[in-house]
Regions:
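Bacterial Sec-dependent N-terminal signal peptides
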Residues: 1-21
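Accessory carbohydrate-recognition regions in carbohydrate-active enzymes
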Residues: 21-349, 353-397, 403-452, 460-486, ...
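ATP-dependent phospho-/nucleotidyl transfer catalytic cores
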Residues: 457
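Conserved catalytic core of nucleotide polymerization and phosphodiester-bond processing enzymes
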Residues: 673
């Protein structure tokens, strides 16, 4: 069998060892399904190709995953879903168990949350209008359904290949009967992903009695069916409580791959497959083992860890095949897609270098396969489509992080070439950035954010250039890494839009968060601190030594009112700090660069308390493919990657009393927190392997070699901890 980075084939009989309560029991997949979280409650495996679960059939931003907890009806169960994105797509191959003929059957069914269940690798719900209990579980590339029908001669499974959400639209669909228990088909669509092709194969536990198919609303009787909107009804006679099971295998390459995906599940024992999925989730969750007396904290923590394993997702089938954007079939060992890099480069991707180290080479090689086809690294790739969503070229820090952490399994030279070429392309304003030293606001919207982010990405390229001895590039990328200064206005103390003539955009209101503007999903306050590679340089541009600290203080204390047509992404406010959107995520930790780590502790504890909960609306903003959750995981265990590609994690205020990190080497890194409580939130002292540790950060290397980190907490700040620049995190402008 083919090997994957998680399991060889499908381990249907994998049994978790160890003692104590299972960690999967602390995961609540409904967290984030309400409000603006945009998560889904369906069944999947870590990074699985299949995400099978319910769709409400409601159009709208808060249904970007196809499901929102506030809804009361279900239109079907589709096999692909996005986790926490701000744009809706996927929801491919919608199926619905129902009772009734095609002429009489209703489109959707009501349901009650009291009759709905979800856990890692499982989803179940009673469809009230049909008296059908629907359950589903999954392997990596195959979904397994179990439907308990009432006594009826018109029990039906409906395939609605024209089903789509938001801007997505089916362009062509296909359905063919192989025999009374086997079917194949495809759905091609366009939307956020312009060229999306999903092939599927179906195997039933019981032969159908009859099949009725509509093509573009017209009933057809033929051997195979092709049209924009294919609707197929598979009819059965059932006894009361009779369960019909169905396997649906997927491939993004061809029918052969979809049929092969069915072979991941070689049993009709639904409960066995469900247990196997839960066991696999248990194994992955156990890579971070925390100890806390607070059950709520444990539920939020392990649901957060679960969320970080929902993206990226496997794109290649069991043969290694996948389709490129032009329709060619390519082959790769393990190809991954769905990379929300503007979000995940900040903390979700760095977290994977700790918890999923063995997966990182597959991710980077997927980026390089994308580069081979497109000529540059992905920005926001969805099923290998470049959506060009958001700003920056943030595959660069992800690749740089892997190289600087000495993670092997990909070609460093090719990776550097891809990084450099992505920065030297003439699209997305890079030519303006090179020519002016900033993005002019009269040439492009979101110019301030783009300038800041390009400067950071260029710093990442600089680090790799130094490591690989590409000295011919170091001068130019050193210069470019400082271009953020070109959009800073000393008079107002804010980063501002600047036109080609060098003049600042007027009028200027730092509270205005509108679209379009010089800022991405925010205002001048929220985009005033993104210089993660050079916080010392940012401090120096203020007229007084404590100017940056005062500005940070003001961020958290000024009015939360904003002007303009504020986008809903700008949420979770403390003053103008907006935790519901990613540009704010590193800011609370910046105090440690200013030798005021106790201020970081205050804000980090406040953010964890206010903006994370174990309820459907427990996320204050979009989950964004794991980034919102990754912030919590890092913060709860006591540190955060302010500069994601630096290999440094800045201390904050650990929420849990202990965390044991299981490392790829088989060793562990233990974090023991002494005298921890709601009031004892300030770090008093730290030891690493029983030796005094005075730095306000810890390195990736120190974590991955294993050891014991002991953090002593207290109710008052220790004015002697983290107060010297030499013990602080690195900055480009700070020589050590």
């Amino acid at each position: 069998m083919k090997k994957v980075f998680l399991i060889p084939g499908l381990l249907l009989c994998f049994v978790m060892g160890g003692i104590g309560q299972r960690l999967v029991d602390f995961v609540n997949p409904f967290i984030g399904t309400g409000g603006h979280g945009h998560t889904y409650p369906g069944a999947t495996l870590p990074f699985g190709m299949v995400q099978v679960g319910p769709d409400n059939g409601t159009q709208g931003w808060d249904w970007s995953s196809g499901y929102n907890y506030a809804d009361t009806s279900i239109a079907g169960f589709s096999h692909t879903h996005l986790s926490g994105t701000g744009i809706g797509d996927l929801c491919d191959i919608s199926v619905m168990p129902m009772v009734g003929t095609p002429d009489t059957a209703i489109v959707r069914s009501g349901f009650a949350h009291s009759e709905e269940r979800a856990s890692p690798g499982f989803y179940g719900v009673r469809l009230r209008d049909f008296s059908v209990y629907a359950e589903m579980t999954a392997s990596l590339r195959c979904a397994m359904h179990r439907y308990a029908f009432p006594a009826s001669t018109s029990s039906t499974i409906r395939f609605n290949l024209g089903f789509a959400i938001n801007s997505d639209k089916t362009t062509e669909s296909y359905f063919r009967k192989i025999d009374d228990s086997t079917f194949v088909g495809y759905r091609f669509s366009t939307g956020w992903a312009k060229y999306q092709k999903v092939y599927f194969a179906v195997r039933l536990s019981k032969p159908v009695k009859s099949t009725t198919v509509f093509v573009d609303k017209k009933k057809r009787e033929q051997a195979e069916y092709t049209g924009r909107d294919v609707l197929a009804y598979l009819n059965f006679d059932t006894k009361a409580g009779e369960a019909i099971m169905m396997k649906v295998g997927l491939s993004f390459a061809d029918f052969e791959g979809a049929v092969e995906s069915l072979n991941e599940i070689r049993t009709w024992d639904f409960n066995l497959v469900r247990r196997s999925a839960a066991d696999l989730w248990e194994r992955e969750l156990r890579k971070l083992q925390i100890n806390t007396a607070d059950k709520k904290t444990k539920q939020i923590f392990y649901t957060s860890l679960y969320h970080t394993y929902l993206a990226p997702t496997i794109f290649s089938d069991r043969y290694g095949n996948y389709k490129g954007v032009k329709g060619e079939v390519y082959n790769g060992k393990m190809v991954l897609s769905v990379n929300s890099l503007w979000d995940t480069f900040r903390a979700a991707n760095p977290l994977l270098t700790i918890t999923q180290t063995e997966m990182v080479p597959s991710l980077v090689n997927s980026f390089l396969a994308f580069y081979d086809q497109y000529g540059y690294l992905p920005v926001w790739d969805l099923h290998f489509n470049e959506t060009n969503t958001m700003t920056g070229y943030h595959a660069v820090p992800v690749v740089a992080d892997a190289i600087m952490k000495n993670i092997r399994g990909f070609d460093y030279e090719k990776a550097y070439k891809a990084m450099r070429r992505s920065a030297m392309q003439n699209i997305r304003g890079t030519e303006l950035y090179r020519n002016f030293g900033f993005i002019p606001a009269d040439k492009m919207v979101e110019s301030v954010t783009i300038t800041q982010e390009y400067a950071y990405d260029d710093w990442c390229i600089l680090q790799v250039a130094k490591k690989l001895k590409k000295y011919e590039d170091t001068a130019s990328f050193t210069r470019r890494a400082g271009y953020w200064k070109n959009v800073y206005d000393e008079k107002t103390g804010f980063f501002r839009g600047r036109n080609t003539n060098g003049r600042w955009v007027r009028p200027f209101d730092p509270y205005e968060a509108t679209i379009p503007s010089p800022y991405t999903e925010g205002n001048a306050w929220q985009h005033n601190f993104f210089v993660p590679h050079d916080v010392e340089g940012l401090r120096k541009i203020y007229s007084t030594p404590d100017g940056l600290e005062n500005k940070l203080d003001s961020l958290f204390t000024v009015s939360s009112k904003m002007t303009g047509n504020t986008p809903p992404d700008v949420s979770g406010l403390i003053g103008q700090y907006a935790h519901g959107n990613e540009p704010s995520h590193h800011i609370a930790y910046m105090y440690s660069y200013l030798q005021k780590p106790w201020k970081t502790a205050d804000r980090v504890r406040e953010i964890m308390s206010k903006f994370y909960n174990n309820t459907p609306d427990g996320l204050v903003g979009n989950e964004d493919c794991g980034q919102m959750s990754a912030w919590y995981i890092f913060s709860a265990i006591g540190f955060y990657p302010v500069n994601p590609a630096s290999g440094e994690y800045v201390f904050g205020s650990p929420l849990v009393d202990q965390c044991i990190i299981l490392l790829p080497s088989g060793s562990t890194f233990r974090i023991n927190v002494l005298d921890n409580s709601a009031t004892n939130k300030y770090i008093q002292s730290i030891t690493l392997n029983a030796k005094p540790y005075t730095k306000s950060f810890i390195t990736h290397h120190d974590i991955m070699v294993g050891g014991i980190l002991e953090i002593k907490m207290g109710s008052r700040p220790n004015p002697k901890f983290g107060i010297t620049a030499i013990d602080g995190p690195a900055s480009m402008s700070l020589a050590k």
